[in-house]
Amino acid sequence: IDVPKDFSSAAYLIAANILTDKDIPLIGIGVNKTRTAFLDVLKEMGAKIELHNDCIISNEKRADITASLKKNLKGISISGKKIPNLIDEIPLIAIMAMFAEGKTTIRDAKELRYKESDRISLLLDNIKKFNPNIGLTEFEDGFEIIPSKNLNNDSVDLETGGDHRIIMSFVIAALATDKKINFDETESVETSFPGFFEVIKAWYQ
């Protein structure tokens, strides 16, 4: 299976490794310093992240990435200068926060309201459907998540707004539970990560 080498795609598989307790190495991923702030967030949340076989290919730094969880994830706060290099991964951070211990707060991320969808509102609406017990607060420039155990594993219908990052993020959430998700569309994923569903099925299901 061919896995994209860009970090924005690899981020979903890194999260999947952590939430499913798999340790599948991702080979030759672009690890440009401006794109890998997500790895720092995962470390702060308690994940073990390791880079191996660093090299330069076509003027881009690449490395093999392994990710695992040695203890429970913990909630964190992210704002200010950290946000620009994380903006595309914030939906995925919200998914990780659902399974963490303690509150996660994201601020200064108003740009999310002007992506393929209003990612703040759509993300929180879908989190509430996925797990009605989670505590959510919506801000104009972000949100707060207080995790709670999901006692209901019934299937859930989620609206995507045609936003590929919303879809992929909740696919990763489903891997950590027994919950089945029905999306109103999935075609938009092919624009950013062709073969995403095939990789998920082969590696994690």
Where are the predicted features?
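Short, structured segments at the rim of ligand-binding sites
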Residues: 1-205
